[in-house]
Amino acid sequence: DLSYPIDYREEQEAEKVKLQLHATNVVTNGLQLEHEKACADLVQNPNNFANENKIILSGSSCFNWSKSDPQGVIDDAKDAVSQKIAQDPNTMVIGQSAWKLLKKHPQLKGLISDNQNKLVTLNLLKEIFEIENIVIGKSIFSDKDGNFVRIWQDNIILAYVPNLGNSRTEYDPSFAYTVRKKDALNIDEYTKEGNKVKYIRATDIYTPFLVGAEAGYLISGVNDPSYDSAKDKGDVNE
């Protein structure tokens, strides 16, 4: 559950409908963020993947280094998935810190023709990696200490997810599902503090499951914390 308080004096001074709409948006967006966080924690945990479906980059293989090979790493990841399920990954989630490195990487920039902007865009990345759905994980949440942190870390997740359509069945291979109770999403209100404060509450019941880890691949450690630009020719971090 997530709740948003509205003081009765605040409600009297504001336009009631707009204030309640704002409160509803806040709590529903909060639930969506909680869902994304639960999914991100699940798919960024190396323990949920077989050895053949994950890699932890280190040293000069990290994408800070100009001589690293992101295209080769992605190709190997795609091969690992296709060997397990006979399907290539069609979805990729890139953490924000990993995206900052990829879009400036010399190898990928070298694939852009001279008459184009020398910055790798998301559409170009889809062409280079031959993956139709690429999403940059930019969401931020507040941890238990009140610090704002990224939900998606310096990781890249590849997955095969069946496209929605009439031909899709429950037997199709898929990386993960969220099981949600029917009609579980509910918005209601209640009062506290002697009826002086009204709360708009959103409730949802769901559980994400990593049902087909063999249909996914986790690339961790994209960012080398010991990177030294003085030792690198062609600094990716410029």
Where do the PLM segments sit?
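Sequence/fold signature of self-assembling virion shell proteins
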Residues: 12, 19, 60-68, 109-238
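Helix N-cap / beta->alpha transition motif
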Residues: 5-9, 94-96, 212
